[in-house]
Amino acid sequence: MARMIGGRWTVAVAAAAAFLLRLSGLTRPVRADEAGFVLVARAWDPSPDSVYGAFFVDKPPPLLALFKLGDALAGPLAVRVVGAVACAVLVVVAAAVARLIADERAARWTAVGAAALVTTPLIDLVAVKGEVLALPFLVAAVGLALVAVRDRAAWPALAAGLLAGIPLGLKQSLVSAVVFIAVLFVASYLAGRLGRAELARLAGAAVAGFAIPVLATVGWALAAGVRLGELWYALYGFRADAAGALGEGSVGATVRRGLVLALILVVTGIAIVLVAYLARVRDHWRRDAPLTAAVVGLIACEVVAMSLGGSFWQDYAFELVPGTLVALALLAVRLRERLVLLMVVSAALSLVGWGFWNVSGRQEFHEYDTGVALAQAAEPGDTLVVFGGRADLQIESGLDSPYPYLWSLPMRALDPDLTQFRELVEGPEAPTWIVEWWPFDTWSAQGDLLEAEISERYVEHGTGCDGRTIWLRKGVDRPVPEPDCSP
């Protein structure tokens, strides 16, 4: 393995492997978040009091625009090709940054480590969201900031700021590259590597670059007639309401996901790399204090952003990848190589397990199967609401939803007493179908009242996978959905 990684084609092979392995996601149905983004994008109709119109989602407009474009060109799974390209580019960019801060050998090993992290099913090999798409921009911003300081050049600083700003259009919490640039510039000034005028020139260029994607989003909102307060709420204000909703619920599931995420960080090697770097931070500081300060700031920002996410889903681990790769390149040769081997073995074993599980037909797609069954039973003009929000089921059914929340968290935060849901059920726009994917009383004390109101106007009409109750509005004649819930 060590001799193979020493070859001059290592970076290219690692990038190709990352691309091809990520393309395996094309064989799997669209996931809940991806489906939700596509549905929001399809119905996108901005207004003064709504960024997206019919549906609410707390994600930036550039991300939804990307999903809208991909869906228009090649359907909901098109974004997975974009994700595969992003992962391949990450490998190349990570190698370039490692070459910049270390040497050619570090570049090759870091490239392999990057490929392992973006292709391990322990994090997520299939779905593509903002975290994955942002990775090459974040790492490239780090490299360009280093070039700007080394050459005292404004153009790399401008490019670094631009690339650091783009991830905020993919997920609004991805500010780690901004922190890295700020700390690096200030620390370089304090260390005497930059004069005051040079600091001002580089900082000004970086801020100008950062402003381009931010102002572009603001400009779009103004042109579309969306109030800036609504844009701010969708991106940041909603998080306070979401945190309150999460705090009111049971912490058991969150704690379990947090423990699983912590285990994933260890098994994939991410946590070990970060701990190994921080354990030797004094040595790194003596060799290059400005770089060390910037890397520590990068890692700290990533950890905080991941923690503030609140739900601790396993793909949160992607947020730590940029800091992990930079830290990996700076580790001592022997330690770096051992850790990369650990990453490769971990990714390889999980790929084998994931492949066997899928090829043998053991992988469940219950949301997909239920959605397909509903599509077969429904007639044109039917509508559907999935209680608890399963956008992957919704999109496979082919049915529109008259309820604005396609995810459970917006429902819990913005309709906590289920007032909107109950008004919908009792009103003229009541959906033809309701799938009780979660029991009605899961998150709200009004769940029993909602179930009683639904029972007055709907009848139980079969079950989805895992025994989920399907309700059909009274007076409507449709065949009973019969999902093939294999395995």
Predicted regions and their residues:
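Membrane-interface alpha helices of multi-pass inner-membrane proteins
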Residues: 19, 156-172, 177-183, 212, ...
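Signature aromatic-anchored transmembrane alpha helix within multi-pass, membrane-resident enzymes
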Residues: 12, 207-211, 332-354
